[in-house]
């Protein structure tokens, strides 16, 4: 066994050129009994190879193994730190995604709330408007001494159901073929009670009594005529038609008003103070609802020679039908609203001319008079004041194509009427005469008042070209109203 001094005296071996040398490290090779150890210089990051004697055994290998374990530990620690950072980033991203989803839900909720708020405001506005309309209608009913009673909810639903079903039915199915509604028993009507109620209502209004009717610039008296009303087993017919079956909601409403002791609400506008009824009790007859009237020709029975008229159906509707002229005569000629004279019959006449044959229309001309101007001013300033006594004159022209409407005072004279007509016609007042047919009278005295001439409250007069009277004294000119020459 050699001593340490002997090992130091050995010659250092030079490394071979084939072995790669890292320029960044300076290796120290230690030799000793053919043992070599590579040591790393941490200060210069260079590897040095130092040859150690064999007496040091495996010291170099142990140092290299320690360095590798530290490197692995460091790499594992860094990898663990990176994994923790990645996990933290993932958790942060998930948290941000949840916040984004929550914000999106909040935005959607706010948008829905905004739309619902707008809808609530619209509904509130509509509710306020409907409440105001209901209040106005209740005040209107109170003005006539009426009160809204209402209807049961189930009855309203049934009426709406009937209306909707009738709208959906085809004409052929409704008029020609059997339908499920035909098997339903119509509502029972107490005819005796209905006739008694109609009689009581007619007694409230005296037949032939004059009522105040609005006319241009004021009002006039009009004689009431009873309304014809026919009672059939399956419905009623008011005026000259159309036929109204009992299952119709509007007919039921009309009958309900009568049975409750009120005039039908549908007649309120035309007859605000009521109207008498002329009832025809035809409860034993059934009015045909198929729209087919009696066969107009003659029929033959098979196997017989006898010719007979088909008259075994319901009786023909008696009386003349409602013509357009009759309908227009039931309407007021004109009304005054806010100081303006509004023609009522004119626009309706123009509409009816497209569908109904109308006679030659008479042009109605409203003449501006002092009484009309004062009445217009009164309606604007103090409409609640009573209407003063007035006289409404309707004067037809010579050819009958024009009719002049004049609102006059009872103290106005014939001369005032003549001057107003001459001014409206743009002609001389001496070129025409004013006369009445019943009694036949010519109004030549211009100083006579309308009250003295019997032209109050209204009258219908005619115009004619002035005639030259002969010189015979027996046909002298009257100083006032006289008989026709």
UniProtKB/Swiss-Prot annotation:
What GO molecular-function term can you cite, just one?
ubiquitin binding
Q: Does the keyword tRNA-binding apply?
A: no
Assembly, per entry: Interacts with GNA12, GNA13, RND1, RND2 and RND3.
InterPro entries named among the record's database cross-references: NSFL1C_SEP_dom_sf (IPR036241), SEP_domain (IPR012989), Ubiquitin-like_domsf (IPR029071), UBX_dom (IPR001012)
Q: Does the keyword Coiled coil apply?
A: yes
**GO CC, alphabetical:** cytoplasm; cytoskeleton
Tissues showing expression: Strongly expressed in testis. Also expressed in lung, brain and thymus.
Cite the entry's keywords alphabetically: Coiled coil, Cytoplasm, Cytoskeleton, Phosphoprotein
GO biological process: any one? proteasome-mediated ubiquitin-dependent protein catabolic process
PANTHER family cross-referenced by the UniProt entry: UBX DOMAIN CONTAINING PROTEIN, UBX DOMAIN-CONTAINING PROTEIN 11
Sections of the chain in a coiled coil: 67-143
Q: Which residues form the UBX domain?
A: 386-463
- The main location is cytoplasm
Q: Which residues carry this modification: Phosphoserine?
A: 479, 483
Protein localization: Cytoplasm, Cytoskeleton
The SEP domain is annotated at 224-288
Q: What does this protein do?
A: May be involved in the reorganization of actin cytoskeleton mediated by RND1, RND2 and RND3. Promotes RHOA activation mediated by GNA12 and GNA13.
Span list, region Disordered: 1-26
Tell me the protein's name: UBX domain-containing protein 11
